[in-house]
């Protein structure tokens, strides 16, 4: 039921460095999206909490306050993730060659191959082999350095946060 979803939300923790990662990218003018095979009840909150521009995930069907066990179409699967990435890039007027995609599982492979730069973040071996770069530490802000973002820019974004 919805109460179980609330309990799950309160037990959710972000990857270390998530706030620094999103804050720095926003400060530098990046547009940020979540394209997840997870659930909108979580990604919508993460979007608001971290100031992310787009969030797409699977919607759980809830009838009379109870989960039905079904998903509402469209289902965010491997192929749909790539389609969403293309749609977001078009909406933001960003060429796919300038898009960075980060993933960890096989369901991310089509999306990763669509982007100009693809990064495995603690990814499965198949994802690491397909990626342009791989980050194998648990800190999401480590991705900033893969993107060539300077320490000074990270510190400036953090300094601007009260």
Each model region followed by its residue ranges:
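C-terminal cap/substrate-recognition subdomain and adjoining C-terminal extension
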Residues: 2-162
């Amino acid at each position: 039921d919805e109460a179980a979803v609330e309990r799950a939300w309160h037990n959710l923790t972000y990857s270390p460095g998530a706030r620094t990662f999103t804050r720095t990218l926003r400060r530098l003018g990046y547009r940020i999206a979540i394209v997840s095979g997870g659930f909108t009840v979580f990604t919508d909150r993460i979007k608001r909490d971290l100031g992310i521009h787009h969030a797409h995930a699977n919607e759980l069907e809830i009838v009379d306050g109870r989960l039905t066990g079904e998903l509402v179409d469209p289902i965010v699967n491997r192929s749909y993730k790539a389609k969403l990435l293309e749609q977001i890039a078009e909406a933001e007027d960003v060429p796919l060659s300038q898009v960075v995609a980060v993933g960890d599982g096989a369901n991310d492979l089509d999306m990763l191959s669509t982007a100009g730069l693809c990064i495995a973040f603690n990814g499965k071996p198949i994802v690491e082999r397909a990626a342009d770069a791989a980050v194998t530490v648990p800190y999401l802000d480590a991705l900033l350095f893969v993107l060539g973002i300077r320490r000074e820019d990270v510190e400036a974004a953090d300094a601007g946060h009260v």
